[in-house]
Amino acid sequence: MRKIIAGVFIFVFLISNLYADLVAEVTTGVIQKPLVTVVSDNVVDQFPQQVNFVIVADLNHNAKLQANDTIKYEIKQKQNIPWKSLKSDYVVLTKYTNNSYNNYTVEVQILKRNDTSYLQAITYKNINVSLMRALAHKISNYVYQKLTGNQGFFLTKLAYVKVSNPYARYGRLYELIISDYDGYNKHVVLRQTDNPIATPSWSNDGRYIVYSSYSGGSMGVYTLEIATGKVTRITNYKGINSSPSFSPDGKEIALALSKGYSDQTNIYIMNLSTKALKRITINGINTAPKFSPNGQSIVFTSDREGRPNIYVASVNSKYPQSSILSTKIHQAYEPNYTPDGKNIVFMNQSSRTSGTQIADFNLANGSVTNITNGKADSSPTVSPYGDMVAYISTNTRGYSSLDMVSLDGDNHFNIETADNGNILIQSPSWSPKNF
């Protein structure tokens, strides 16, 4: 029996001279990221410490900045900032005013070493303590954008599947969970017993998740409206109905269908209004389709040449036709475009290394770079602004974890870990925007 739990979810100008100053120095092959220190000029209670702690964590979870926190003491005026001892390139100075019970005004100022003026300042008014993490992520987005010129992703969400009792014959519990990007504020939005939930994927407007599941002994593709919890079955073909993903405009989905009980699956595009299908592939086992950011092509996995690899097909071709992405790749699965369409991130099984890692394929020069070094890394999903990749890592004991890595492979951190083999974490999908 399915139980639905409804989920309700609750500045872009550039400063050219600031960005010109923000250049990472390269010393002996190591990129030195600009250091940001977060301090407060008045520690009124624990609330400032909690907010600043989250800001520091956010500014360490990216490829362009690093941060630390010196809230153990107060800075009364910007002239008193001990730049020499801080060794910081920038300071984020926060001031908290307790307006009333559990309600604050927060002022944020960005300061630069050897500069006596504020670079940027913003004020957030009437913030309730219950919004502590949301406020911190919002401040982090503001700081990140002002210091890098790129949009922050700290108010984005992750959807993923948690399976309890995965090896039991009966009583397996599948939960579709939505959390903040860093794993906090988890909400179960769909719960099913003995009917798997697989490969969730967001619509571009963030309103729907499409996924595959079983019901009544047959496989189908479903949409979940996040705000209401409404589930709609949209396919009912015999055999395999799997790996759905939305087109950028939300009018179509790409999916894998066997159209019967054959040993082959093919990629189709379904018009969500008419339910009309367009076939994209014609032979082999084809699965895990993803649209390009412009919606003009689909990247997917196929074994048509004897082993799984990545192929690309045009959505506008009159007849099914596709080509292998690169002969440099030995075996590959689960491809995803980066938001700018310049790279493809995938699960890589190289002939030179054991196990599977997450890798990045550069479409311009054809280079392949592993960005993780685990033995069983899978299911990559790219952040909406392209800086980070979330994925599943499984250790030698079979315990799974939801982890994150920067696209350059430099910054790794854990989001959630299954602390025993009786729980599996699967199929992460990154939301397309901040909420």
Curated annotation (Swiss-Prot):
GO terms for cellular component: periplasmic space. Pfam families: PD40 (PF07676). Keywords: Cell cycle, Cell division, Periplasm, Signal. The Tol-Pal system is composed of five core proteins: the inner membrane proteins TolA, TolQ and TolR, the periplasmic protein TolB and the outer membrane protein Pal. They form a network linking the inner and outer membranes and the peptidoglycan layer. Belongs to the TolB family. Part of the Tol-Pal system, which plays a role in outer membrane invagination during cell division and is important for maintaining outer membrane integrity. This is Tol-Pal system protein TolB. It comes from Francisella tularensis subsp. mediasiatica (strain FSC147). The gene is tolB.
